[in-house]
């Protein structure tokens, strides 16, 4: 008999951890950190102890107490069974910290599978010094729609569309039917056909675990398309007489490439922070121009209408030296991500002080409520588990589909019958 339990993503956005068990074997889907900027016990200068980070997280309840997952050499005697049991595998949906951020603490004997692009992106991030907490994870590639047999399970990876390359959903075949997991998914991005293909391939699943991020934000009918974001960025480039300031998420590489192309098309050069530039170059992007503290300010002052400067919060003081008459700040889902981030208010204060107008042009990586319902209608599972949401009860299943609202902390849901 197969069971499903949830160890993250319950009542919060992000940090999904779905554990499927059968006959002593386990498949874990995603293993990320909670996204809680400015919150928790470690903030305002209080940091975790070097070499004791895993222990600090375990003792403060930040990560789940799942036995036989974590590295024994990082536990420091914590009373939880460590090391691999030889019967556990981890499958990661994509390279966002709330889905992959704990992989550095996974015992090295546990196989960690992901898409080829996710592995490649993680390698590029490592070149830039952006690595998961802990130790470098050993990632194994799972081919597109190429089943992997693991104990009694048969796990198949499908590409889906999200705001990061390499995003995947999974179908886990158990003795009681298929458990399908969307990971993070959308239909308004550049590749909606990928998400729709996944939904079609897992039609009739015993259970569908689906993200519900946008359910948390009240009534929404639609999301802006990615191509609309490109067009709005080009509009800003053309209509702004002076310097364009922009923030965007560097792991959204397709948007990065599109912005670079639009900027070149109107004769502007994008100046990237050094860490981003290193990552882009490791990924394989060409003609990546880096902000150089010794030379870039003079270049920008001489011809502000020929440049776009990528701004991160720690870059804000440099704006004091730049020509900002006729400038605009374009927010395209970069840092700070939104009003929930303490740095958001600080950014607004800086822009107000500098008298730079703010323009938000981004779009999210998560399906709208209407699109979530569309995906559920396409799959028509027996059981629906809404996850990765503050308001999962807002996802109303169609007739004939039973909705179970996951409870955190290891409660098992049997796939053999109703709980």
Role assignments for model-derived ranges:
Residues 220-318, 323, 387:
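Hard-cation-handling environments
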Residues 110-120, 209, 269-277, 329-333, ...:
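Short internal beta-strands
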Residues 105-110, 178, 236-244, 264-266, ...:
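Short, surface-exposed connector motifs at secondary-structure boundaries
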Residues 2-89, 98-253, 258:
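His/Asp/Glu-rich metal-coordinating catalytic cores
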Residues 78-80, 232-233, 313-322, 366-377:
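A short, acidic, amphipathic alpha-helical segment used as a generic capping/interface helix at domain edges
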Residues 336, 341, 357-419:
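Internal alpha/beta domain cores that form substrate/cofactor-binding pockets in large enzymes
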Residues 137-147, 289-296, 403-407:
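Short acidic-hydrophobic, aromatic-tinged amphipathic segments that line or gate anion-handling sites
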Residues 315-355:
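Redox- and metal-dependent alpha/beta enzyme cores, enriched for Fe-S-associated oxidoreductases
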């Amino acid at each position: 008999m197969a069971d499903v339990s949830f160890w993250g993503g319950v009542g919060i956005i992000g940090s999904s951890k779905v554990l499927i068990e059968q006959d002593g074997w386990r498949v874990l889907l995603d293993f990320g950190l909670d996204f809680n900027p400015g919150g928790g016990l470690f903030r305002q200068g209080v940091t975790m102890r070097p070499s004791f980070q895993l222990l600090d997280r375990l003792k403060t309840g930040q990560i789940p107490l799942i036995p036989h997952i974590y590295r024994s050499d990082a536990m420091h005697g914590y009373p939880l069974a460590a090391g691999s049991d030889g019967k556990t595998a981890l499958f990661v949906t994509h390279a966002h910290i709330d889905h992959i951020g704990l992989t550095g603490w996974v015992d090295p004997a546990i196989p960690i599978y992901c898409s080829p692009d996710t592995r490649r992106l993680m390698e590029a991030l490592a070149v830039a010094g952006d690595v998961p907490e802990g130790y470098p994870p050993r990632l194994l590639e799972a081919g597109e729609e190429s089943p992997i047999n693991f104990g009694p399970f048969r796990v198949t990876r499908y590409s889906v569309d999200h705001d990061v390359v390499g995003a995947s959903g999974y179908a886990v075949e158990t003795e009681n039917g298929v458990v399908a997991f969307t990971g993070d998914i959308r239909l308004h991005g550049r590749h909606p056909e990928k998400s729709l293909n996944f939904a079609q391939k897992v039609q009739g699943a015993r259970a569908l675990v689906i993200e519900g991020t946008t359910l948390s934000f009240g009534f929404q009918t639609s999301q802006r398309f990615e191509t609309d974001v490109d067009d709005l960025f080009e509009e800003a480039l053309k209509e702004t007489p002076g310097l364009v300031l922009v923030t965007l998420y560097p792991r959204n590489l397709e948007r990065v490439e599109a912005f670079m192309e639009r900027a070149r098309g109107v004769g502007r050069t994008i100046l990237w922070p050094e860490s981003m530039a290193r990552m882009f170059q490791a990924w394989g992007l060409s003609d990546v121009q880096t902000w150089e503290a010794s030379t870039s300010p003079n270049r920008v002052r001489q011809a502000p209408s020929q440049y776009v400067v990528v701004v991160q919060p720690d870059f804000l003081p440099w704006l004091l030296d730049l020509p900002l008459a006729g400038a605009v700040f374009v927010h395209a889902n970069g840092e700070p991500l939104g009003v929930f981030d303490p740095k958001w208010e600080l950014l607004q204060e800086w822009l107000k002080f500098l008298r730079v107008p703010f323009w938000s042009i981004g779009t999210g990586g998560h399906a709208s409520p209407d699109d979530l319902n569309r995906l559920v209608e396409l799959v028509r599972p027996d059981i629906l588990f809404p996850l990765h949401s503050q308001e999962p009860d807002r996802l109303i299943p169609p007739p004939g589909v039973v909705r179970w609202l996951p409870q955190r902390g290891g409660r098992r849901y049997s796939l053999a019958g109703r709980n």
